[in-house]
A protein has these predicted regions:
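Extracellular beta-strand repeat scaffolds in secreted/surface proteins
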Residues: 40-44, 62-64, 243
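Acidic Gly/Asp/Thr-rich repetitive segments characteristic of extracellular carbohydrate-active
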Residues: 14-50
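Short glycine/acidic-rich loop motifs that flank beta-strands on beta-rich extracellular proteins
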Residues: 49-55, 67, 73-79, 99-105, ...
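Right-handed parallel beta-helix/beta-spiral solenoid domain characteristic of secreted/periplasmic
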Residues: 20-27, 59-104
Length: 263
């Protein structure tokens, strides 16, 4: 790979390169991030990396060569944890949890960075968790697939923008939103072939829900509890989204949305 293929750093700092097959470069993304300054970016060349990335109280710029070319996996905990990350961008990486304990592939607490063109898969919990009252992350154009619970779970007062994602073949819901104060923007996501419903809104949660496609899920296109607050209101959701071709129907309101999984 020549220098022309290394992405430009718009911040004007250095680009630290990760390449496990070339001893001139960093062997793991976490090692490069330890040395990265505020204006630096980390670029990950194609490969499979066993690593655990934890970033807190700073911005981050972590760029992979593409989610089909770069995989970061972890056996002991989720491969990506962001805590109070106040800016930056993560893109072009597949995050995969291969352990047996209860962890997610991508964990975002009270952060405001952009995560795009990534993939989150095989979490024992939800693939992606976005949580905390200061969470304003932008999660867009990602694939979230084959996780043991839901694809994307927004809770504990988070208000992220969740758009243009493909959430498929997750064991519970494509996207789930819970708790008072939680108010994501769910826009133009595709929730397909999930084993329960496409989108779940419950326990006093709010959400903007427009232009989403929920199809071929095992239950409903959209499921909500009476205490939830969708925008638009419930009887307008079918017009604002594509909720057809789900066996039980477009949407329903239920006091016990988790009864099918014994909760």
């Amino acid at each position: 790979m020549n220098e022309d293929s290394i992405p430009h750093n718009p911040l004007g700092g250095k680009t630290l390169i990760v390449d496990a097959r070339d001893e001139r470069y960093y062997p793991r993304p976490s090692a490069a991030l330890e040395d990265a300054g505020e204006r630096d970016q980390v670029y990950i060349r194609p490969g499979i990396y066993e690593d655990k990335i934890f970033v807190t109280e700073r911005s981050v710029r972590l760029i992979g060569a593409g989610r089909d070319l770069v995989q970061i996996f972890s056996r002991r905990g989720g491969p990506l944890y962001l805590q109070r990350v106040f800016g930056g961008r993560i893109s072009g990486i597949t995050f995969r949890y291969v352990g047996s304990d209860q962890h997610s592939a991508i964990n975002v607490l009270d952060s405001t960075c952009v995560i795009t063109q990534c993939r989150a898969m095989e979490g024992i919990l939800s693939g992606v968790v976005l949580y905390g009252p200061e969470c304003r992350a932008t999660f867009t154009d990602n694939e979230v697939c084959r996780n043991r619970e839901s694809g994307i779970f927004v809770f504990a007062g988070a208000q992220p923008r969740v758009s243009h994602n493909r959430c498929m073949e997750n064991h519970h819901f494509g996207i789930a939103v819970r708790d008072p104060g939680s108010h994501p923007e769910l826009v133009r996501n595709e929730c397909e072939a999930n084993m329960l419903s496409g989108i779940l809104l419950f326990h006093h949660a709010e959400a903007l829900i427009v232009d989403n496609i929920c199809r071929n899920n095992q239950h409903w296109g959209l499921l909500m509890t009476p205490d939830s607050h969708p925008n638009p209101v419930s009887h307008e959701l079918s017009a604002a989204n594509q909720l057809q071709t789900n066996p039980r129907g477009a949407y329903t309101i239920s006091e016990q949305p988790l009864a099918d999984i014994g909760r």
